[in-house]
Every structure is written in structure tokens, then in C-alpha cells.
Design a protein with these regions (language model features):
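Periplasmic/extracellular loop-to-transmembrane helix junction in inner-membrane transport proteins
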Residues: 1-7, 25-61, 76-78, 226-227
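Interhelical loop and adjacent transmembrane-helix boundary motif
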Residues: 2-6, 31-42, 199, 205-248
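Cytoplasmic-entry segments and transmembrane alpha-helices of multi-pass inner-membrane transporters
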Residues: 6-10, 68-107, 161
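Membrane-interfacial helix termini and adjacent extracytoplasmic/periplasmic loops
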Residues: 1, 40-45, 80-81, 100-138, ...
Length: 258
């Protein structure tokens, strides 16, 4: 195409970036700077710590479960096992609110039964803490960790696994000494991907969070609901930056792997 046509296409692409990201992001930065003295305090710092701790814990749990499931398939050699484990990763296609409602009924029912069997000062042990929320994250984001780890195992292949077994290493020693080092980039990618998804997840957290428990996403939502649009920019900005930085790291991991 001619130079004018190239400039037109370049301008259209830049316009999309400007309207879709740079202008809204600049507005958020302006609001965040303007309202920082009213919003950022010790309680806001605790919300940041809780959000990052919850996301980190959920990431480790989900990636651990993905490794266990996929290694069970890898060791068993049964093709049917792969279809069974795939069921565990269907939650990503289901809306968060639906998962939340679906989890609440059985967990609360089990909690009430547990209360009758072993009374614990009248407290609902599982549904009053973070258990339901962590379990919901596990159901919702298992596919993210599962697919990343599955890719790593497929790239590693099974030949080196078989060679390790022939040299006398047992199953778990092979996993620890051979497989995990080979898929460490996939593990890092899975951890980062799940971390970002948990940080920005709203419906699940709103429905299943314990009383008076806030994350950055719920804090931004509450402020926006109360017409504190400018004040919500601080939490929103942290969520956005938390989503951007891992993407940059993931791109570096992918480039190095190629």
C-alpha cells in the first residue's frame, strides 16, 4: 500500500490504543493523584496486602492441584484419565456468580451438618472464613493453571520420564528432580496468570467474601457504587498495573522459551 494508506492504518491503530487505554488510564492516574490523600491510609494498605496475599495463596493452590492432576494422568498412562481431569477445568466457562451460588448451598449444608456433629461455639467453620472463596477460585481458575502446566508437560515429553524411572528413581522423585525443573517456566506462567485473574475477580469475591473483607476489586466497586468515582481510581489503578506487569513478565518468559 502507498504511504498515505499506511499512515491512515497506523493512525487508526493508534486511535484505538488512545481511546481504549491511554485516555482512560491517564484519567485514572489524574484522579488517583488528586484523591490519594483521602484514600491511601493504613486500612487501604491492609486491603492491598489482603488482595495480594489472597491472590498469591490461590495461585499456589491452583497450580499445585493442576500439577497433581496432570502428573496423575502422566503416570497412569490411561487416556480416559485425561478426560476426567478435563472436567476439573470447566469452571472457566461458567460465570463467577453462578459458581458462587452453586458452591454456597453444599458448603453451607455441610457446615450445618458439621455443626450438629461437632458444635464449635455455634460457628459455621467453612462458610464463615475464606474456605468458600478459595474453593470457588479453584473451580473458576483451574483451567488457567491446568492449561499452562499441561503445555509444559507436553513440551517436556515422556521419554526423559521413562529414562528416569529406568535409572531407579521413583515417581515422586522423578517429579521433583526431573519434571518440575523442566516445566519451571510453565509453572511461573501459570502462577502469574492465575494471580492476575484472582486480583481482578469481582463477582465471586463480592458474593463469597467474609464479612467486612475487602479486596482491591471490591473496594473499587464499592466506591464507584457510592458515587466516589474519583476515589475508586486508586484501587482500580493498582489492579490495572498488577495486570500489566505480569503480562510483560509472561512475554519475556515466552520469548526466552522460543
Amino acid at each position: 500500500p502507498s504511504k498515505p494508506v499506511q499512515w491512515v492504518f497506523t493512525g487508526v491503530c493508534l486511535l484505538i490504543v488512545l481511546l481504549g487505554f491511554l485516555f482512560p488510564f491517564s484519567q485514572l492516574v489524574y484522579w488517583a493523584i488528586k484523591t490519594a490523600h483521602k484514600v491511601i491510609d493504613a486500612s487501604f494498605g491492609m486491603i492491598v496486602v489482603k488482595s495480594f496475599s489472597l491472590a498469591a495463596g490461590s495461585s499456589v493452590l491452583i497450580v499445585f492441584m493442576a500439577i497433581v492432576l496432570l502428573y496423575a494422568v502422566r503416570v497412569s498412562g490411561m487416556h480416559g484419565m485425561r478426560y476426567v481431569t478435563r472436567i476439573a477445568s470447566l469452571g472457566y466457562a461458567i460465570p463467577g456468580a453462578v459458581i458462587a451460588v452453586g458452591i454456597m448451598a453444599p458448603v453451607i449444608g455441610f457446615d450445618k451438618w458439621l455443626l450438629r456433629v461437632a458444635p464449635l461455639d455455634g460457628k459455621l467453620l467453612l462458610s464463615s472464613g475464606l474456605f468458600m472463596l478459595l474453593f470457588a477460585y479453584l473451580v473458576r481458575f483451574m483451567a488457567v493453571g491446568y492449561n499452562a502446566i499441561d503445555t509444559g508437560f507436553q513440551k517436556a515429553g515422556k521419554d526423559i520420564n521413562d529414562a528416569s524411572r529406568m535409572l531407579g528413581f521413583n515417581t515422586w522423585h522423578t517429579l521433583w528432580k526431573v519434571d518440575l525443573p523442566l516445566i519451571r517456566k510453565s509453572i511461573a506462567a501459570a502462577l502469574l496468570s492465575v494471580f492476575v485473574d484472582v486480583i481482578k475477580e469481582l463477582p465471586l469475591t463480592l458474593i463469597l467474601r467474609p464479612f467486612n473483607f475487602h479486596t482491591l476489586a471490591t473496594k473499587a466497586f464499592d466506591m464507584a457504587t457510592n458515587e466516589q468515582i474519583a476515589e475508586s481510581a486508586n484501587a482500580s489503578l493498582i489492579v490495572i498495573l498488577t495486570g500489566i506487569l505480569p503480562v510483560v513478565l509472561l512475554n519475556r518468559i515466552i520469548r526466552k522459551s522460543h
